[in-house]
Amino acid sequence: MRKPFLFLCLFCWCFCVSAQRYQQLVKLGLEQLQADSLLQAEATFREALDVDPLIKSNALLYQYIGNIQERRGEFQKALDSYKIGLTISSTTISLLLCRAALYLRLDNQERSMADYTEVLNLEPNQTEALFYRAYLYTQHRDYKRARADYDRLVKLEPMNEKARLGLAILNDKDRRPREAMEQLDALAQLFPSHASIYLVRGGMYLSRKQYELAQSDIEHAIELEPENPDCYVSRSQLYKALKKKNLAKADAQKAIRLGADPSFLTP
């Protein structure tokens, strides 16, 4: 009768050693990740996967590996890692959010929308998913659904600047220009030092051919954030509308030097 008992004790001891080793590797991998030692962190996480390939928490390790691959620009590998993680645990919200964000980055809006919707099916008040799904609905001109998501988000977080800014942009697109401007005026009062608000409002003034008001807002945004390439993109567009070609070109070149996408500045 002693042999089965001894075997059970040996099994329990091995299991404890394995679990301890797994936890040590995960902790080390996270420390390496925080120190930006990406290659070492990935190797450590993969070693942890080898120690215990069946544990459900491996879903998070695949998330970390995917994050590392994404930072290296290995987008397809990152998507594959997220997929494996979701195969292990299909309801891990952080994994779904990572994949949704990467799909959005790769302009695969349909799959990004599907992942954000799945997150909201699991957690209806998940604020990141609400914001980006509202953005995607706006891009698809599904203003009714976009408004529902933005309204829900603003109710959850009344001081969420990005949500309120998104709602103002939506109202402008949805032929509610007065409401949009009122919302932007309110945001400028609440967040007077945030350049993004003045850039959006300046853009709306520009679309209405209210050039002096547009220039005032854009110039103020530049004062607030002189290294923000979006400021010079906006002023370049203003100068184009005013037929000041040399000034428009100079601002376009400066925006590119600061990191703007050149495709946004084509004639």
Predicted ranges, named:
Residues 22-23, 56-60, 93-94, 127-128, ...:
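Helix-start (N-cap) detector for alpha-helical repeat units in TPR-like alpha-solenoids
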Residues 233-267:
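Terminal, low-structured helical/coil segments at or just beyond the last alpha-helical repeat
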Residues 53-56, 90, 124, 158, ...:
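Short coil turns that delineate tetratricopeptide repeat
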Residues 34-35, 68-71, 105-106, 139-140, ...:
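Register position in tetratricopeptide repeats
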Residues 27, 60-64, 98, 132, ...:
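Canonical tetratricopeptide repeat
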